[in-house]
Amino acid sequence: MNLKQEKIAVLLGGTSAEREVSFNSGRAVLEALLKQGYNAHPIDPKEYNVANLKKDGFNRAFNILHGRGGEDGTMQGLLEQIGLPYTGCGVMASALTMDKMRTKMLWKAFGLPVADMKVVTRETFSELDPQAVVAKLGLPLMVKPSLEGSSVGLTKVKAVEELKSAVEYALKFDNTILIEEWLAGDELTVPVLDNQVLPAIRIVPEGEFYDYEAKYISDNTQYFCPAGLTPEREQELAILVKRAYDAVGCRGWSRIDVMCDAKGNFRLVEVNTNPGMTSHSLFPKSAATVGISFEQLVVKILELSL
């Protein structure tokens, strides 16, 4: 199958809170494809009706949309309906992993390690008992929306009095909020490409956690790949990540975030089914350490499209 003879839509932008990030990823992907002789075109679903792709002669989609509307199963479902092959995870894995709470519940059911958490919804917010939550989970706490990506709406809660306002803030972004035990150890992210686990990256943000600014804007966030784990720990992490990837039904490529608790135990955090592909992005950094260039990575992801 010669993909260079196909007309490829690079889906970028979109309508989520992560629109700008998706543009940055999309431009980098588009440039890599064009440089290698692919017939690729930028398509922003905010400006163009994706249902017309096939009619307009497109054969395949490289989906680099981030967040709701692009990474949550809806775009995948639309592409399935029109019969257009696309990169990344399918409808079910995309929809499931967009929901951090249900992803963690599934992992827990598989016996995989996740942080202890309390779930609060808009409906149950009035019954929230901060004292009881702190008694169970301790301090500090992490409060985050279940559905929004890119670390939007996060708060670190250091005192019981701050919990309610942190939940109220998170409720601006989603109806379901997770209050989680604070994981004090290393922050790691692990890419998976075509069922192969790539080297882990250790993230050391300048601030207290890896928020939107640290992720996309700050040059002071430090990344270490290799992550400085012993070979045994790297192996243990790779096995855990592959089990987590398979449990939620990922395919093609994804990146799984993992935190360590104070004792160094791994805790699964979330799945990114369309990881960032910018100059700052972590997936390309990891791939580079095993000799896969950015251009090769883009082509490989395209080749894995179903």
Curated annotation (Swiss-Prot):
Organism: Haemophilus influenzae (strain PittGG)
Reaction catalysis annotation: 2 D-alanine + ATP = D-alanyl-D-alanine + ADP + phosphate + H(+)
Primary localization class, coarse: cytoplasm
GO cellular component: cytosol
UniProt feature coiled coil, ranges: none
Keyword ATP-binding in annotation: yes
Biological process annotations from GO: cell wall organization; peptidoglycan biosynthetic process; regulation of cell shape
All residue ranges annotated as the ATP-grasp domain in the record: 104-303
EC number: 6.3.2.4
Primary role: Cell wall formation.
The organism's place on the tree of life at top rank: Bacteria
Gene3D superfamilies associated with the record: 3.40.50.20, ATP-grasp fold, A domain (3.30.1490.20), ATP-grasp fold, B domain (3.30.470.20)
Record-given protein name: D-alanine--D-alanine ligase
